[in-house]
Amino acid sequence: MNPLIQSLTEGQLRSDIPEFRAGDTVRVHAKVVEGTRERIQIFEGVVISRKGQGISEMYTVRKISGGIGVERTFPIHTPRVDKIEVVRYGKVRRAKLYYLRALQGKAARIKEIRR
């Protein structure tokens, strides 16, 4: 990688990101701007994928809200996310959990790991 690009991206990387992967349940505190006000909106769900590397790394969180599946994709190093909390560590055997989109109720549960 070009040293100039590398030096620019190192300044943008966040160091307060907890370790998490697909299958973990996370609580994302996202900053939302509404007009002139800014507030924090909490989005809690299961991480179904994590892709990319470096400054462009992203993760997708899925939750069920009102019986409808909602997915949001966040960049890991964005300043729009105030903090990420890991609520529960899940035990899965895949890196991408897109099959959860077709499952409902108890079938969509993920086994928990005690850490």
Curated annotation (Swiss-Prot):
GO molecular function: structural constituent of ribosome
Keywords, sorted A to Z: Ribonucleoprotein, Ribosomal protein
PROSITE patterns: RIBOSOMAL_L19 (PS01015)
Gene Ontology process terms (BP): translation
Pfam families (UniProt xref): Ribosomal_L19
GO cellular component: cytosolic large ribosomal subunit
Record InterPro entries: Ribosomal_bL19, Ribosomal_bL19_CS, Ribosomal_bL19_sf, Translation_prot_SH3-like_sf
Job of this protein: This protein is located at the 30S-50S ribosomal subunit interface and may play a role in the structure and function of the aminoacyl-tRNA binding site.
HAMAP family xref list: Ribosomal_bL19
Family: Belongs to the bacterial ribosomal protein bL19 family.
Protein name: Large ribosomal subunit protein bL19
